[in-house]
Amino acid sequence: MSAAREVAIGIDLGTTYSCVGVFQHGRVEILANDQGNRTTPSYVAFTDTERLVGDAAKSQAALNPQNTVFDAKRLIGRKFADPTVQSDLKHWPFQVVSEGGKPKVRVSYRGEDKAFYPEEISSMVLSKMKETAEAYLGQPVRHAVITVPAYFNDSQRQATKDAGAIAGLNVLRIINEPTAAAIAYGLDRRGAGERNVLIFDLGGGTFDVSVLTIDAGVFEVKATAGDTHLGGEDFDNRLVNHFMEEFRRKHRKDLSRNKRALRRLRTACERAKRTLSSSTQATLEIDSLFEGVDFYTSITRARFEELCSDLFRSTLEPVEKALRDAKLDKAQIHDIVLVGGSTRIPKIQKLLQDFFNGRELNKSINPDEAVAYGAAVQAAVLMGDKCEKVQDLLLLDVAPLSLGLETAGGVMTTLIQRNATIPTKQTQTFTTYSDNQPGVLIQVYEGERAMTRDNNLLGRFELSGIPPAPRGVPQIEVTFDIDANGILSVTATDRSTGRANKITITNDKGRLSKEEVERMVREADEYKVEDEAQRDRVAAKNSLEAYVFHVKGSLHEESLRDKIPEEDRCKVQDKCQEVLTWLEHNQLAEKEEYEHQKRELEQICRPIFSRLYGAPGIPGGSSCGAQARQGAPSTGPVIEEVD
């Protein structure tokens, strides 16, 4: 039989929620996780016994706030000193420390202090999405397309790619979220002719606007703009601050230092925010929020809009910028497409609609799933899927920021302009600044400012061995090359000697080295083994518990009550009680110990129930072992048959 054809998945790695899709049999399937949810919280929790990812991690966040990590996307690819990281630290219950200028999350796991890079936390979420896909497909998954905000810079893209590698994925492509959403929107509108589409993507932590032209399966991005630090969580923060102040006013108590109270308040605020998208008022009821005080309050939609008014208004600036860069008037936009959960907020819809002079907004695609949908389509294209629907699909994306190098006086000389279609390659010739200069330092920057000090340094390298010559004579050719992932390589060549040097902006400071990624891959495998051992342990404990209660229940069944001699009944009851007491005191025992306890109980039960039925095995509850041979009565505990 031929092996199953390899498929690639599309993953929307979100700030607050993630989503995975696969393109099969001509259509995209968005996959539900083990809880039946089509989106999975981007949360990882560490306890004394196990590591939890997704729904399980988020649901215990209030009980374990300092070891429940979220928002890794707001840390990934950033420096610890980054002002946005410093402002976020105030809102996070978990500890973030600096190691060599890079942020690391410090938690307690199995009684030990551990520190993880944001890439490692994100890789755990990606592993969860990978497992979700594998459970659905029934085969291992190795290849994926992962999405990032269009405005993510080079280091954030590379760090996301590293996270994929740590999760054991071959990342086929990093694509921009609004572009992926545009694929989801445009795939079924092939015959509509050329259309200019504006994608307005406001998620849990990031905001993007992209202007595209879609025509006969060609998706050409004209311009992109955004804010990698604006989203639903910022609206939650405004609500949390508002209610914290109200609590202080009403009860003269400051709950800002109590992590558990803050987590419960944040969860209630998130729920209230969602309610306000469909109702004009939301109520918060939190029992014993802080120092035994119950907190009952309400908020109107108008008050919420006032609290966030500056944030809501700020979403229009990138819209104007993207239209300006695309050289399009707002009247030339055919479709305005909403993506991301935060676009459900009525005020944001109204602001956008008013900006476009009352035009209808397009809400035809699922805002939570559109990005994963588009990523799954792109994954199928890259794997060479022959389906007619994706056969001619062509994606032309752009570089979100200008790229250049520093020339005399700290001036930014741009080689690749922002919104240049990628992949792209640009070459320019430079020369020396002083006589007999033996080498040049190539410093690579991204950003839009005239001086390099105001832009972001990506990396630097030296080209040495230039023959002595007066200033202005040597010719140094510098080439900037961006691949389809938006990741940059820079080469410098001395024309007279042919001597060259190059840098791929991947192992620059703030990046993980190849060795670090490999170490993290090994550690991820170890965590997986630990997780499986924990699952086996829990299964063995549950099996023992179920068996004990099944035996106890059987003793009280009417049909058996009179058939079991009193001495045997007492013997079984005493043993059951002994096992239950042992269970109470050994919640963290090893799998083998649970199995040993079960075997001991079985040894006492087996002869008693065998005499009763005249058979070595007795059918009963499905959780307690193998079915006995046919013809035996269908009551009593299940005893596993031994060959």
UniProtKB/Swiss-Prot annotation:
Keyword Nucleotide-binding attributed? yes
A GO cellular component annotated for this chain's UniProt record is:
cytoplasm
- Which molecular function terms from Gene Ontology are attached? ATP binding; ATP hydrolysis activity; ATP-dependent protein folding chaperone; heat shock protein binding; protein folding chaperone
Pfam families the record matches: HSP70
Spell out the residue ranges making up region: Nucleotide-binding domain (NBD). Answer: 3-388
| SUPFAM superfamilies given in the database record | Actin-like ATPase domain (SSF53067), Heat shock protein 70kD (HSP70), C-terminal subdomain (SSF100934), Heat shock protein 70kD (HSP70), peptide-binding domain (SSF100920)
Instruction: Give a GO biological-process term.
Output: chaperone cofactor-dependent protein refolding
What keywords tag this UniProt record? ATP-binding, Methylation, Nucleotide-binding, Stress response
PROSITE patterns the record matches: HSP70_1, HSP70_2, HSP70_3
Q: What induces it?
A: By heat shock.
Kindly list the positions at which N6,N6,N6-trimethyllysine occurs in this protein. K563
Substrate-binding domain (SBD): annotated segments:
396-511
Chain intervals for the UniProt region annotation (Disordered): 620-643
Q: Which residues bind ATP?
A: 14-17, 73, 204-206, 270-277, 341-344
Entry function: Molecular chaperone implicated in a wide variety of cellular processes, including protection of the proteome from stress, folding and transport of newly synthesized polypeptides, activation of proteolysis of misfolded proteins and the formation and dissociation of protein complexes. Plays a pivotal role in the protein quality control system, ensuring the correct folding of proteins, the re-folding of misfolded proteins and controlling the targeting of proteins for subsequent degradation. This is achieved through cycles of ATP binding, ATP hydrolysis and ADP release, mediated by co-chaperones.
For domains, the record's comment is: The N-terminal nucleotide binding domain (NBD) (also known as the ATPase domain) is responsible for binding and hydrolyzing ATP. The C-terminal substrate-binding domain (SBD) (also known as peptide-binding domain) binds to the client/substrate proteins. The two domains are allosterically coupled so that, when ATP is bound to the NBD, the SBD binds relatively weakly to clients. When ADP is bound in the NBD, a conformational change enhances the affinity of the SBD for client proteins.
Q: What family is this protein classified in?
A: Belongs to the heat shock protein 70 family.
* Name recorded for this polypeptide: Heat shock 70 kDa protein 6
Protein's organism: Sus scrofa
